[in-house]
């Protein structure tokens, strides 16, 4: 376990990614991602929430069993959980079926927030989900501000972006644009 080293970070919000399984660079993309962070470590680091992945379309029983057990463990220590929806066949992650069913399943398993990729019919994804849905970054071939604006119009409650910001031509302007969309 560790702690935040810099006092200037003490008032920032920290969401700690708690699961991993594989990457698109490897020879195998895991059908189930395993949790690698304990609730006690999350608290020791001062994190405000965790983000884990739910992988559908592969070893669903094993994947969802682990997600459910992990959500329960974090909730026992009052740690909010964000669940990101992925497909075992990564090329299908941005499909309506994966995002729609994944959002509903994650909420039913106890997720406090669902991180979903924008798909045609995104309003159905947000309306089927009884917890807030935040937008995942997704493909870099579209203007992220346009996608974010559309997602908000269709029920998204916020964003969880990484590469869409730090690989942007002007990351500060991208963050400012996203913040302006949220009011």
Region spans (language model):
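A short, acidic, flexible beta-alpha connecting loop/helix-capping segment that sits on the rim
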Residues: 163-169
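Alpha/beta enzyme core
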Residues: 1-24, 28-135, 140-161, 172-175, ...
């Amino acid at each position: 376990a560790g702690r935040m080293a810099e006092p200037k970070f003490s008032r920032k919000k920290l969401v700690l990614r708690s699961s991993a399984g594989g990457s698109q660079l490897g020879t195998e993309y895991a059908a189930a991602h395993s949790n690698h962070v304990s609730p006690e470590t999350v608290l020791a680091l001062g994190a405000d929430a965790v983000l884990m992945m739910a992988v559908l379309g592969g070893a669903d029983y094993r994947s969802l069993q682990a997600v459910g057990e992990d959500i329960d463990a974090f909730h026992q220590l009052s740690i909010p959980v964000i669940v990101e929806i992925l497909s075992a066949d990564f090329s299908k992650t941005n499909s309506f079926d994966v995002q729609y069913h994944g959002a509903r399943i994650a909420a039913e398993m106890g997720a406090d927030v669902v991180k979903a990729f924008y798909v045609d019919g995104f309003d159905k994804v947000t309306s089927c989900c009884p917890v807030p849905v935040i937008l995942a970054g997704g493909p870099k071939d579209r203007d992220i501000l346009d996608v974010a604006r559309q997602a908000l119009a269709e029920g998204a409650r916020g964003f969880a972006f990484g590469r869409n910001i730090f690989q942007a031509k002007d990351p500060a302007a991208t963050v400012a644009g996203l913040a302006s969309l949220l009011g």
